[in-house]
Amino acid sequence: EQNISDVVELERAGAQIVAVDATDRTRPGGQSFADFLIQVRLESDVVLLADVDSLESALIAESLGCEAIATTLSGYTDIPAPPLPNIRLIEQIANRVSIPVIAEGGFSHPQSVKDAFSAGAWSVCIGTAITNPYLLTKNFLTAINQA
């Protein structure tokens, strides 16, 4: 769970951009995202990347002044989502906001990256697919064994 001190510490450590949970989940102490963001803006000048799970949370994040949106939390909250990567959500958000949309979550094939850019993504974040050598090797072995 993220709180204001986390954001301030990250900024002091040199972070210029901090990702924040921009869903409707309650923060520590029962704080809403809007209240959390107001507090962040009072205590920090860091650029905020809103990690969202839905079009609604993306629209709210933009209206509250977040500088960019990432689809990081699609499929990780109570809101139903298709299998990752959620290209449909990327397209919905990109068509409705004026800030950069970073496609994140489930990108492991070049075609899905291409699809994300075609859907309007400003950038694509690839994580586990390249940072987890065990998973990467397992995927190659699975493909080899199916050949």
Go through each PLM region and give its residues:
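A short helix->loop->beta-strand "cap" motif at the edges of active sites that frequently abuts
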Residues: 45-46, 99
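Conserved beta-strand positions in the central sheet of alpha/beta enzyme cores
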Residues: 19-20, 49, 70, 125
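Catalytic domains of carbohydrate-active enzymes, especially glycoside hydrolases
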Residues: 12-17
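Active-site-adjacent beta->alpha loops and helix N-cap segments on the catalytic face
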Residues: 1-6, 22-41, 55-60, 77-94, ...
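Short secondary-structure boundary segments
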Residues: 22, 52, 73-74, 105-106, ...
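Histidine/lysine/aspartate-rich catalytic loop segments that bind and position anionic ligands
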Residues: 47-81
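Catalytic cores of alpha/beta
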Residues: 2-10, 53-65, 97-103, 107-126
